[in-house]
Amino acid sequence: MDSRDSRKYCLTLHMKTIINVKWRMKKLLLTLLAVWCMRATAGAQAFDEHFVDSTLRLDYVLAGNNHEQQAYFCKASKMSRWAGRKNRLAEMPLKGNGQLILSDHATGRQLYVHTFSTLFQEWQATEEATRVNRAFNVSFNVPLPKHLVDVNITLTDFHGKVVGQLQHTVNPADILIRQVKEPQLPFRYVWKGQVQSDGEPDITRCIDLAIVAEGYTDSQMEKFYTDCQRVVDALFAHEPFTSMKSRFNVVAVAAESADSGPSIPHLGRWQSTAVGTHYDTFYSNRYLMTHDMHRLYDLLAGIPFEHIIVLVNSDIYGGGGIYNHLTVTTSDHPMFRQVLVHEFGHAYAGLGDEYFYDDSYETMYPADTEPWEPNLTTLKDFGSKWADMLPKDTPIPTPPAKIPDYRKVKTEAERQQLNAATQRVGVFEGGGYQSKGVYRPAQECRMKINEVENFCPVCSRALVRITDFYTSQHNSHK
């Protein structure tokens, strides 16, 4: 074989190799696509086997004191369309302080799991709860079952022990389940993460976030819609939300109030508003919250939603966030953006407060129990938290670095030092309102102070994980 034939042979062999590699890559991609499609289809089939594409609303009252919890069923209603997840239905991403489980009545098989926390359970940590019984109402949306189901409500204490439980049966054909046909209030989408061919938002592939007007009169509704756009801009200006914006829909719900602004009890000001929010919750001036979840869900009847932000028409600092319950924030305070993002971290991803006091009334995170919040640890089971993110040879507890006092920052260089502290992962003592025995993952974070821009890496991962969970198109962790 001469040199020319040799070069021709090598070139032919090389081309065959390239073609074979390309073919193998194509087969691999087709196989992966087929597996993804089968998993997505399997998820849809699992949902369709047990549920219809509608919503069942369940209303309860939770009552008790600092050591007792009871749950009482009130009523049920149903609405067209289901805005929640259709995959990973029986999985529990976070334990929360309570769990709602739907099980098939005939077989006992778990069909759907929803975890949550409530204002009632926060109240149990107050001094008032040691001397009086109180009741709070809650509502839950679940997919409408095709057949008879058992509903199990479980309430846990600070040790994770079950202290309250209710089980009852729901028959979807029950004539006393009220059918809600149309939305009761005007609403407008201010952001659509994904749209269908008809231009409507895709409520199956996206997380549906409802912003409800509170303390806005009829003449202030255009201000409300403008404020809602500010909410969208503020929330998605922060990572990891910026990168996940296409996985959210945001709908503005124009709930009209007779009076402008919320109630302020310590000033003797009581208003007539759509949701009934007020400052001074649990006698804390800044704690702005509503006690009436039934009323809030009534306003949202017929509107697809999974998470709620109550936007309060006020320039006074305040707000609150409770896991899988609601976020409350004010519209016009100078720190509106920071408060919104912090409180939404609580409500959406179950992130705990990373600040602490030396005189906390109640130990909410006892040493013998690992917190369920992903960004707090008592070291009881640190391996389940951010141990995998800890740099090698990091001491536990991690000594804090010398950084500027966030209350005295004046220069850009000092602000950069503070923000840099959010990205150093360690095990810093102090968190969950307790100065001792509870540890947080970063020296500073959006869940600790308002003066930094970023979530720490541990909180960011938690936000991404919960978003992946809600928007998953298949039924596997992998």
Tell me what each language-model feature is.
Residues 175-239, 252-262:
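Fold-level signature of zinc-dependent metallopeptidase catalytic domains
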Residues 1-47:
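Bacterial Sec-dependent N-terminal signal peptides
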Residues 223, 320-341:
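Short pre-active-site segment immediately N-terminal to the catalytic Zn-binding motif
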Residues 215-218, 256-260, 314-318, 334-336, ...:
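Solvent-exposed loop/turn segments at secondary-structure junctions
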Residues 247-323:
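Active-site-proximal segments of metallohydrolase catalytic domains
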Residues 337-354:
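Active-site recognition of the HExxH zinc-binding catalytic motif
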Residues 50-178:
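Beta-strand-enriched, solvent-exposed domains that form extended recognition/catalytic surfaces
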